């Protein structure tokens, strides 16, 4: 009953302020501001805004690296609208609760940039200054859900924005000034933690790229230009999530099997330079790290290539399985040509 009365009261007050907004318009966010203020007054009476005009409703201090305004944040978050509807999230538990869990989707911290014009102004206002390990639940008005940056907080109200009122429940996992060095440190930790895979034969001849032979007996023969070879491969993230494979059993074991796909060795078209390598009958281009792994290989060899995101999918990532700024691992085996 209280919830119904509260809702009726808010609707009444919102209609009143919107009515006033029709009579007096002083800027593109006049009605939005009145509506937002009415919602705050009803749901969080007595709370005061901070910074540019955000409202912190829960906060837990961290003890790790301090988030600065020109770097990269690893963060977990749940995003909702003012009604509590979840619009985005990073964790597996929320996906399961919503019935949207998918074994092929990456769940975990994602990278946010804190450089101006690359992050919502209100979100940057909330997280810059936090420390890794800290958590904050914050309400951000629609006019601060913009990538634009202004000198004064009043200027955000004066400029139109397509943003919506948003609630972030965000936890800072880590912060770095250099995402590339951070990725390299992630790779080197993975190598250190897996001595059963990496040995003295490992090659690191390019920044952010590591090649590890897996075969015991390796030919010294190299492939000639215009050669066609066949490979099986499996691609993984550092956390073990398999995002692509040519091997049917691996696909089934990792929940990404598709009956619409034909599994088995795929063709690689060799070239004069590693940038010339293409995949399949359609001559599809391949990411740099994948090509570099192949370029180090010899006939009938099995090997592993591990590389940072500038040699992979960079800041964009790829689909739901590969978030931006992700180091990748490819296990590749050169095999005989399949029989027709």
Regions found by a protein language model. Name each.
Residues 1-20:
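Sec-dependent bacterial lipoprotein signal peptides
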Residues 20-340:
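Cross-family detector of peptidyl-prolyl cis-trans isomerase
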């Amino acid at each position: 009953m209280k919830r119904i009365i509260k809702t009726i009261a808010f609707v009444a007050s919102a209609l009143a302020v919107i009515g006033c907004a029709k009579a007096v318009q002083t800027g593109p966010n006049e009605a939005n501001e009145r509506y937002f203020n009415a919602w705050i007054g009803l749901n969080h009476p007595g709370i005061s805004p901070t910074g540019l005009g955000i409202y912190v409703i829960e906060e837990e201090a961290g003890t790790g690296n301090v988030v600065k305004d020109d770097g990269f944040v690893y963060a977990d978050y749940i995003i909702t609208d003012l009604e509590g509807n979840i619009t985005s999230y990073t964790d597996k538990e929320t996906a399961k609760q919503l019935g949207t869990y998918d074994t092929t989707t990456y769940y975990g911290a994602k990278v946010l940039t804190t450089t101006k014009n690359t992050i919502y102004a209100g979100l940057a206002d909330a997280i810059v200054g936090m420390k890794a390990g800290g958590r904050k639940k914050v309400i951000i008005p629609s006019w601060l859900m913009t990538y634009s940056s202004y000198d004064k907080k009043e200027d955000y109200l004066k400029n139109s924005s397509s943003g919506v009122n948003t609630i972030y429940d965000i936890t800072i996992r880590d912060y770095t000034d250099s995402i590339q060095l951070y990725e390299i440190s992630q790779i080197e930790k993975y190598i250190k933690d897996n001595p059963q895979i990496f040995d003295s034969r490992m090659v690191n001849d390019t920044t952010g790229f590591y090649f590890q032979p897996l075969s015991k007996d390796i030919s010294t023969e190299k492939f000639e230009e215009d050669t066609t070879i066949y490979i099986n491969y499996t691609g993984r993230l550092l956390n073990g999530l398999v995002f692509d494979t040519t091997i049917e059993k691996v696909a089934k074991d990792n929940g990404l099997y598709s009956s619409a796909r034909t599994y088995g060795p795929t063709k690689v078209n060799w070239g004069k330079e590693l940038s010339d390598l293409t995949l399949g009958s359609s001559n599809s281009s391949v990411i740099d790290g994948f090509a570099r792994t192949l370029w180090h290989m010899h006939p009938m060899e099995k090997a592993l290539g591990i590389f940072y995101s500038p040699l992979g999918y960079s800041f964009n990532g790829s689909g739901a399985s590969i978030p931006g700024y992700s180091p990748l691992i490819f296990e590749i085996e050169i095999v005989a040509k399949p029989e027709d």
